[in-house]
């Protein structure tokens, strides 16, 4: 069995990960997969997720914990283990760092959202949240678009500074701005990506603040979490979700639905965009991702196959 840690997974090219995420959406369209509802256990502010999924060749199970307060102790908020197995024999093939898989595939989900929902003319963007996922979102944003100015906001100034320093090593040909407030970031950005576990909207907005912009919410995955104010979904020309499970799981969708700000039939699955060649020019769009085990499966299987080919990782025996 192959063991792949964070460093091994980090050697995989971003294009491989994003292609794997796109393959997951294609499987959604073809329905050639089996993805049971994930088990979602809450313990006060903390969450445990068990996420299984099956395809023709592989099946995968990810066990992930989300402890938001861990960052205050210098620890990552998300930890996890991914097991990839052969769907013919049932034999485990690989064990992987689940947090690294989550960070990479979720970054690619946001990146693919940027690629499909925006034009190449966008030059300004903002990231709300400077944790592991905020960094991953920034990397995939910059992989897909030549941004000239990137605004970053976090409650921790040190986290913002650290994220900027890390990004500069890989993407040096742009201006980085440590936003003083979320509102400053939103006003000055064409694309806004939120990667937080906020219990309440990160900012207040007027219609002029949001008109013609793309909003991507990545962080909220419980009904009591909401990153964006409901005026965005109310005024949006289009609302997309990676899975319809988001209508129940995330407060960014569930709360506006409960308050009758939007009707459920106005919410579309992002996978449908892969069948079209639609261009969204000057549209206000909300894309909400809560993630799904199918992303983990296609990402893990792509990484595994490339790791075997290139002799990446460590072989283990039970």
Regions found by a protein language model. Name each.
Residues 1-102, 111, 121, 294-297, ...:
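N-terminal ligand-binding/catalytic initiation module
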Residues 117-124, 210-211:
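Short helix-loop-beta connector
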Residues 124-125, 150:
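Conserved hydrophobic helix-helix packing surfaces used for dimerization/oligomerization
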Residues 130-131:
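Glycine-rich Rossmann-fold phosphate-binding loop(s) that bind the pyrophosphate
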Residues 134-135:
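N-terminal Rossmann-fold NAD(P) dinucleotide-binding loop
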Residues 143-170:
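NAD(P)-binding Rossmann-fold cofactor-contacting core
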Residues 173-256, 261:
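Rossmann-like adenosine-cofactor binding region
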Residues 221-318:
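Adenosine-phosphate binding glycine-rich loop
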């Amino acid at each position: 069995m192959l063991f792949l840690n964070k460093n091994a997974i980090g050697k995989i090219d971003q294009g491989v990960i994003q292609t794997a995420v796109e393959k997951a959406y294609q499987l959604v369209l073809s329905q050639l997969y089996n993805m049971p509802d994930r088990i979602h256990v809450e313990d006060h502010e903390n969450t445990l997720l068990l996420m299984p999924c099956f395809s023709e060749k592989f099946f995968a199970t990810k066990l992930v914990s989300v402890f938001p307060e861990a960052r205050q102790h210098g620890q990552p908020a998300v930890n996890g283990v991914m097991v990839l197995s052969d769907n013919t024999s049932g034999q485990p093939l690989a064990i992987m760092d689940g947090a690294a898989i989550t960070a990479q595939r979720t970054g690619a989900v946001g990146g693919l959202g940027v690629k499909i929902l925006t034009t190449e003319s966008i030059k300004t963007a903002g990231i709300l949240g400077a944790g592991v996922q905020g960094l991953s979102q920034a990397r995939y944003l910059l992989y897909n678009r030549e941004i000239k100015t990137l605004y970053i906001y976090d409650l921790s100034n040190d986290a913002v500074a650290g994220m900027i320093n890390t990004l500069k090593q890989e993407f040096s040909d742009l201006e980085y701005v440590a936003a003083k407030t979320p509102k400053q970031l939103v006003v000055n950005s064409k694309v806004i990506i939120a990667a937080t576990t906020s219990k309440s909207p990160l900012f207040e907005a007027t219609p002029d603040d949001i008109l013609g912009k793309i909003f991507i919410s990545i962080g909220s995955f419980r009904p009591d979490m909401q990153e964006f104010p409901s005026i965005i979904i109310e005024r949006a020309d289009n609302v997309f979700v990676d899975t319809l499970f988001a209508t129940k799981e995330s407060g960014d969708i569930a709360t506006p639905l409960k308050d009758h700000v939007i009707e459920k039939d106005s919410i579309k699955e992002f996978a449908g965009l892969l069948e079209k060649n639609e261009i969204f020019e000057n549209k206000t769009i909300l894309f909400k991702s809560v993630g799904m085990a199918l992303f983990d499966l296609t990402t893990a299987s792509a990484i595994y196959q490339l790791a075997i080919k290139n002799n990446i990782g460590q072989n283990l025996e039970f």
